[in-house]
């Protein structure tokens, strides 16, 4: 066959398309992925038929599927489909705009060549939808651009025989010599139009334009070099001599009117919807997160309206305009993420994010201080010739997720994790050994060395926990000094009060965290005895509800204990119709149980309780459970930590209403910001605090590693657009590598340069104990990763958990399993459907 890579990838596209055809033939309405696959694959088949042109196929692609053949969200998710195929005259790009543009498609064309039966259109119901994924609800009012700047009007005539287009931030005095206007008045001025737009002068055109003064230090660079330097009226005669000497069109315009932007005579204003179409939503606008019912309202926008950083042809970030000239690399950003809506536990706001040396060095307004107002452009956020741009207009940026309950059963879990937006993994294991399949322990120093070395080039921060189940300290110091950044107590190794006490004593000496999976059997005691064994010392309780393991039926009581830092694992997130039914077999496999042994079955069944799973939902919403993690391949799904967090938040909004920001219902705002901040903290800052590395990762804050995830709002929580790891793009949606542009199908999450060679280690951290760092494991193991010590975890309490510090008194009825918090029964119904699911995923 001699297949090249692009052919192999197109085969995968064809398989997805054929799968979609089979589902369509059964009368199923297609989701986003299926619709894209079917359209792209069919276009390639029509290319092979050889009797249609590119233009023909661009039109035909819009005829295949209608709104009734796809799920209601799909027309809003699917804007274009692009694919490249081999025509008789070579490889060509076909772009289908608005591919779902009619009520019914042509199903004969959609199934052409498949030999599948064409279903009746009666199989497809018409379901309208008022809400759509990623929708923006705009604030009323208008935004005035370049407010308080000096402004004037000029007449401009194009004397050329070609069109001339001038961008918003081009120094107008430097414009094309064939444009005739009053260049003296234009000194130090630019167009008063939205940033990144332009005015086009056709041959012979005469237009009146409004100019505004440049901002900042008022320094002109670039263009034709006519007025190079600081704007200084005393030098204007010299500048005008250059204008005339170099043949630049100039004509006095005494009819010019002058004023100040804001006085109403020279203003340029846009409404919020128009503004968002160019730069993304701004203060007061609300964004639907994916297809959930959660709305994030932008609380603050650091932009200076009219001076936004926009990259592209004729846009703002060009030499002498938004990009500064004359600044060394040391004064400029390595990378700037522009116009991002940041969703973080610290707030929901819009800003540029500046990255240097892999760290977030500033958040605010980036650009060129020579032409942009100094009260806007942060001195740490200068864009220069050494700066790369990641355009995030209309996008959401979050901190990279942290999964702090990982069974390292297979290395491929790292690929799944980063593709979902997880950038830090904490747990233990050695591969698919039975101990690892059940417990997160990396037991021996040789295992620890193996795991740190084997994950060294992965573009993910790593931390490994040793086994803590022993009643004597012997052996624990060795694994800690070998690199363990924490210890794990697991019932499969014996989580007895004696082992708990000893493990915590050693952890206190080394300032590391202890994670515990308690005793489901109640063999050495019940939950109150385990709590007593803690002796008020800090401990992190895994799957604190109990389905993942722990004292039956009331381990959930620990969520009301001050020194306990509770977390959940994601199979029970949220409580759905099928949650209970899937768990028994999951548990039997993970814990090496035998369904032929009655006691093993009873052990498994005792852990699965609908009542406590339902209560877990509500405790999360109250902020009484602080973390959500995966329990990867050991009763958990590593690629769904983020998705299931937002599914839980959405379920709680639907069942409990808007979350008030205080005890008074009247304090609820007309948005979901508080709930959103509470839930994002569960997989970002709180696991970072619990594990002792919040100085390095866990939030979008200055000084932290630039581990950032970029999302399209319509795909938020389901599928990221790009994952930035330590300032480098490590994973991103990328199309056909042979294509003329990056977007033709098949588009998939692929590793980028930040994940290859030594880049993965250079942009990531290996977290170890202080003792291990001081012992020099970085050198001993020849690690490329930056090695950092965890710390300040002993003495943490629930009150240190951001936005998740509630301490209700929890009781569980041992017979009915009814859970109460401060006397209130915690009860909710399982949901039959969740968002971030069927609209997005193929399987």
From Swiss-Prot:
GO CC field: urease complex
Cross-referenced PROSITE patterns: UREASE_1, UREASE_2, UREASE_3
Domain annotation Urease: ranges: 400-843
Record has Metal-binding as a keyword: yes
PTM info: Carboxylation allows a single lysine to coordinate two nickel ions.
Subunit structure: Homohexamer. Other oligomeric forms may exist depending on pH and presence of salts.
Protein name: Urease
Organism: Oryza sativa subsp. japonica (Rice)
């Amino acid at each position: 066959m001699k297949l090249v890579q692009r052919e192999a990838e197109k085969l995968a596209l064809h398989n997805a398309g054929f799968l979609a055809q089979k589902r369509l033939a059964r009368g199923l309405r297609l989701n986003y992925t299926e619709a894209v696959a079917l359209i792209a694959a069919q276009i390639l088949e029509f290319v092979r038929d050889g009797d249609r042109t590119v233009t023909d196929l661009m039109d035909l692609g819009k005829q295949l599927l209608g709104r009734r053949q796809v799920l209601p969200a799909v027309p809003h998710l699917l804007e274009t489909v692009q694919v490249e195929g081999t025509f008789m005259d070579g490889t060509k790009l076909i772009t289908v705009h608005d591919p779902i543009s009619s009520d019914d498609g042509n199903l004969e064309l959609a199934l052409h060549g498949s030999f599948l039966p064409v279903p009746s259109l009666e199989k497809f119901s018409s379901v309208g939808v008022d809400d759509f994924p990623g929708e923006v609800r705009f604030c009323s009012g208008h935004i005035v651009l370049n407010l308080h700047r000096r402004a004037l009007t000029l007449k401009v005539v194009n004397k050329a025989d070609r069109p001339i287009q001038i961008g918003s931030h081009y120094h107008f005095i430097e414009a094309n010599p064939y444009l005739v206007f009053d260049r003296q008045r234009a000194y130090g001025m630019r167009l008063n139009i939205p940033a990144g737009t332009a005015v086009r002068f056709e041959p012979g055109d005469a237009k009146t334009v409004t100019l505004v003064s440049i901002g900042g230090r008022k320094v002109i660079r670039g263009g034709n070099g006519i007025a190079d330097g600081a704007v200084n009226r005393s030098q204007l005669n010299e500048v005008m001599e250059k204008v005339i000497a170099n043949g630049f069109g100039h004509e006095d315009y005494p009819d010019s009117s002058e004023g100040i932007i804001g006085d109403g005579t020279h203003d340029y204003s846009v409404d919020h919807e128009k503004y968002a179409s160019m730069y993304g939503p701004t203060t007061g606008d609300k964004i639907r997160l994916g297809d959930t019912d959660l709305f994030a309202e932008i609380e603050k926008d650091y932009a200076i309206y009219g001076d936004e950083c926009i990259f592209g042809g004729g846009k703002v970030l060009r030499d002498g305009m938004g990009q500064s000239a004359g600044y060394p690399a040391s004064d400029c950003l390595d990378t700037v993420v522009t116009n991002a809506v940041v969703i973080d536990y610290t707030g929901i706001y819009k800003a540029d994010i500046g990255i240097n040396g892999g760290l977030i060095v500033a958040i605010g307004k980036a650009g060129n201080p020579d032409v942009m107002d100094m009260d806007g452009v942060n001195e740490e956020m200068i864009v220069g010739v050494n700066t790369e741009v990641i355009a995030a207009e209309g996008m959401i940026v979050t901190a990279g997720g942290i999964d702090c309950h990982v069974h390292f059963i297979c290395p491929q879990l790292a690929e799944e994790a980063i593709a979902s937006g997880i950038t830090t993994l904490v747990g233990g294991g050695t591969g698919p050994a039975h101990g690892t399949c059940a417990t997160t322990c990396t037991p021996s120093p040789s295992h620890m060395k193996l795991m740190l070395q084997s994950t060294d080039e992965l573009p993910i921060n790593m931390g490994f926990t040793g086994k803590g189940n022993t009643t004597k300290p012997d052996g624990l110091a060795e694994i800690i000094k070998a690199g363990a950044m924490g210890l794990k107590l697991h019932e499969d190794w014996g989580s007895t009060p004696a082992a708990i006490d000893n493990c915590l004593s050693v952890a206190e000496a080394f300032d590391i965290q202890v994670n515990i999976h308690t005793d489901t059997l109640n063999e050495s005691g019940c939950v109150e005895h385990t709590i007593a064994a803690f002796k008020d010392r800090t401990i992190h309780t895994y799957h604190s509800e109990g389905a993942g393991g722990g004292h039956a039926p009331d381990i959930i009581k620990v969520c009301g204990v001050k020194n306990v830092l509770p977390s959940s694992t994601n199979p029970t997130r949220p409580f759905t119709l099928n949650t209970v039914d899937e768990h028994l077999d999951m548990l039997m496999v993970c814990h090496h149980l035998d369904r032929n042994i009655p006691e093993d079955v009873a052990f498994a069944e005792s852990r699965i309780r609908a009542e406590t799973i339902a209560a877990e939902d509500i405790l999360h919403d109250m902020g009484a459970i602080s973390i959500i993690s995966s329990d990867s391949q050991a009763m958990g799904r590593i690629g769904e930590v983020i998705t299931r967090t937002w599914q839980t938040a959405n379920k709680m909004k639907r069942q409990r209403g808007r979350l008030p920001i205080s005890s008074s219902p009247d304090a609820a705002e007309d948005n979901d910001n508080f709930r959103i901040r509470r839930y994002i903290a569960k997989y970002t800052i709180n696991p970072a605090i619990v594990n002792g590395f919040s100085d390095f990762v866990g939030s979008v804050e200055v000084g932290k590693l630039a581990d950032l995830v970029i999302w399209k709002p319509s795909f938020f929580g389901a599928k990221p657009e790009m994952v930035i790891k330590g300032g480098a793009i490590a994973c991103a949606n990328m199309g056909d590598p042979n294509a003329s542009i990056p977007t033709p199908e098949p588009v998939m999450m692929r590793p980028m340069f930040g994940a290859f060679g030594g880049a993965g280690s250079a942009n990531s951290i290996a977290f170890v104990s202080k003792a291990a760092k001081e012992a020099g494991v970085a050198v001993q193991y020849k690690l490329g990763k930056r090695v950092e010590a965890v710390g300040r975890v002993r003495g943490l309490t629930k009150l240190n958990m951001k936005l998740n510090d509630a301490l209700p008194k929890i009781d569980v009825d041992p017979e009915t399993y009814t859970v109460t918090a401060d006397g209130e029964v915690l009860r909710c119904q399982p949901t039959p459907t969740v968002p971030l699911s069927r609209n997005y995923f193929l399987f």
